[in-house]
Amino acid sequence: MIGKATFSVLPILALVLFSLPSRASNPVQSGFDLPQPNGCHPIGTRTVVLKDRQRGRDLLVTMWYPAAEGTSATAPYMDKKTADALAAEWKLQPDFQRLVRTHARPQVPIAEHGPFPVVLLEHGSSVVPAIYTVLAEGLASSGFVVVATNHPPDSLISVFPDGHELRFRPYWPVEADRRAQGVAMGKFADEVLVADVRFVLDQLHEMNSQNHFWRGHLDLSRIGIVGHSMGGTTAALATQEEPRILAGVNLDGSTYPGMNADVRPVPVHKPFLFLATEEHAAGDSRAREYVGSDSNTYYVVVTGADHMSFTDARLISSRFTRDLKPDLNAFERALLTSTLTRSLVEEFFAKYLKAAVAPDLDLVVRVDKK
């Protein structure tokens, strides 16, 4: 549950101010545990490689899921090669990943009381799925199977089990104006990333019927999708275009001039939640894009957040930035936004994939088009 809240309702936007947790883990120690998940399920995790031979794409997919009880060691936050790439990009201390403790155990059996609804998790540009671990573990503990695809060349790095790597490279005209870049990024989202989503969904159907581990555990009649930044754009497009997806969440997703207008009509006619920073919410065009729906649509501005606050990034950087002392205040602010994001997303999917009550989500503005 989220802490006490006060809010004021503007014509379209809800500004929601949530209180800080009464106590936060101290990041000035040698390491720290990621925030404790809200749900009651133990968590498991495993990684699979999906080969799309028709398109010549190998996709590294990490899955978090409700697990059977057990006492085995928890999974590493990320592998060393991925951590080294992220440390170079974000100027983090070497081997920072060794000091971050997760809650998921690798390769453990899935809980027997399924099948469980599925949530696809889409990363932003030049990052990796592991920086959404707080969100993924929270959803898994609440009874969802989370499926996070690493999309080359949009991800910072993909490290495959056989050791080969794929690195980020721009897929837009770097020297072009903002509109031209936006159109190119929108086309990539629609033609590559959404196609990846469809392929992964197809593979999940096969895994649910043939694969020994997953067989019968995935409820593929209840599928949602959540994405951040470019992944948020992907989530919006996939929710709109893919009939198997029932509900979607966009975490401060990219909307460059012309991106969506030149690719697909924008309105999403399904339940949709948009969490935005104040910077992204400054213009009302973004609000009109996402509230132009005939279904339950939520548009929430998280005050004080920046674009990376919806990930684990600020938790990590406040503790492990190279050559700087840990910043406890920054850590607490990051903890607030991270747990707020997780709680709202969990309640949204509980409401629209499980028909559960959502007391905190219902505090924010809901737009119902009649």
Language-model features and meaning:
Residues 101-116, 121-159, 257, 280-282:
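Short substrate-entry loop that stabilizes the transition state in hydrolases
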Residues 246-308:
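The feature captures the conserved acid-bearing segment of alpha/beta-hydrolase catalytic domains
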Residues 8-18:
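Bacterial N-terminal signal peptides
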Residues 199-266:
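Primarily recognizes the serine-hydrolase "nucleophile elbow" in alpha/beta-hydrolase
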Residues 159-217:
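Alpha/beta-hydrolase active-site loop
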